[in-house]
């Protein structure tokens, strides 16, 4: 099996669920919106009750749908949880994509690193509950764990390429291995944010947290600000 079913309701099939064959795709505007409502409702239910205690019937009710209609869009609680995890992941890393990793940003400055860090930590703080659940579920759902590892690999690769660009322009320490540095900095940021926002083990203001992590990043790669264009 690719995953462990942690709650018997995940295999529950109500009388009005579609029988056999592939589930219907939400191709119409209404169908797309219904699917979005189910994902939004699932996120709320997971945050309120956790993964193990969340029920498909509660998700359907929160979304204003019948229990059976859920199965036109998702096969199980595990599947919709993965969809929620993907949406949270996109929100969490969008600041890095927009401010640092975009192809339009050739050389990130100190100010850009700080802004990306601020937005990233703000997203982490907002999504702390779901991120804690994703970490929990990834321990027994191999597909959720695979999603996490794939994102880590993708992000590490993109950050490494930024470091290489900086090294070629003599704006970062040329002795650093870009891949190892990117992986280490990513792990540092994620673990620090987890200790801070999920476990409450770090006591500092948001401003101080952003400033200190930014300084760590800049110092780690010996980042020099690009020369301003004339």
Region spans (language model):
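Amphipathic, non-transmembrane alpha-helical scaffold segments
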Residues: 31, 39, 85, 89, ...
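N-terminal intrinsically disordered/low-complexity leader segments
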Residues: 1-33, 225-230
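Hydrophobic/aromatic-rich alpha-helical bundle segments in the mid-to-C-terminal region
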Residues: 131-136, 145, 167-215, 224-230
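Hydrophobic alpha-helical connector segments
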Residues: 83, 97-126, 178-185, 210
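Generic hydrophobic, amphipathic alpha-helix propensity
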Residues: 30, 34-43, 59-60, 80, ...
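Short secondary-structure transition hinges
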Residues: 126-158, 203
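Helix-turn-helix
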Residues: 37, 45-79, 83
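Short hydrophobic clusters on alpha-helical segments that form packing/core surfaces
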Residues: 38-46, 120, 217
